[in-house]
Amino acid sequence: MNILLTGGTGLIGKALVERLCLRNEQVTILTRSSSPHTLSKHKNIKFITALSQLNSQEQFDAIINLAGEPIFHKVWSKNQKSILRESRLSLTTQLVEFINQYQQHPIFISGSATGIYGDQDEQKITETSKTAKTFTAQLCQDWENIAQQANGRVCLIRTGMVFSTKGGALAKILPFYKWGLGGKLGKGEQYFPWIALEDMVNGILFLLDHSECRGAFNFAAPKSIKQHKFNRTLAQLLKRPAFATIPKWLLHFILGERANLLLESQNVVPEKLLNAGFQFQYADCENYLEDILKNK
């Protein structure tokens, strides 16, 4: 396959590119960075910084859109919210226009997030569950609406928190737990959807290979976990205390609106992936944590 990938130098993108190269696919990575990448060692990868650099005759079998300004890294000022929207909506619009100019339309796999559902307490969330009206939920809805304007097969990946020791949220919090500084966020009763990086990549490849798959897919492990249970499990595996509790008011004081990402409860189920026959390597967070810490 000939594949165009955005976000190819991020945590998910790099892992995906490695797998695509093992499959001997041809990969073109659209990136804002002009610096050399470790991925450039692969002979079947090329880098571009704008769609205009592509040959007008070049035909892609699939376009995978993973690009976007990191959602949690900076305070959500009015300007930052504009950047978060622009980095997703503008590029996705360009990609849709690029796809629709061809008679043979490539598969379009485009990013989204489980944040589209907002806080739903204990209720199980599937792809048909109601969406919310928060900033992140509206961002995801607008992002998906643009992607769905592409002709051909479109898959939307509503991603939970991606776990890996190579980067992302888990890699950032591990040192704090090793220092005995782990703890509950609020009451700790909130579910948070998570997915192992390995399953994230396998899921994208599954969508590529299964032409019957289309529409929105929850990319989260079958078993969401409550924050207090995650906290206790990780602390026990590391043999460290984790008695701290950060109250909701303090999280909101420190993080502002971003605190909602840590406090919303989302018991997400990957119903469509499971019904399509996808098998998760890591369905249970406790088993996943035990496995990665044993091999770290």
Curated annotation (Swiss-Prot):
InterPro entries from the UniProt entry: DUF1731 (IPR013549), Epimerase_deHydtase (IPR001509), NAD(P)-bd_dom_sf (IPR036291), SDR39U1 (IPR010099)
Pfam families: DUF1731 (PF08338), Epimerase (PF01370)
SUPFAM superfamilies: NAD(P)-binding Rossmann-fold domains
NCBIfam families tied to this protein: yfcH
Record-stated family: Belongs to the NAD(P)-dependent epimerase/dehydratase family. SDR39U1 subfamily.
Name used for this protein in its record: Epimerase family protein HI_1208
Organism encoding this protein: Haemophilus influenzae (strain ATCC 51907 / DSM 11121 / KW20 / Rd)
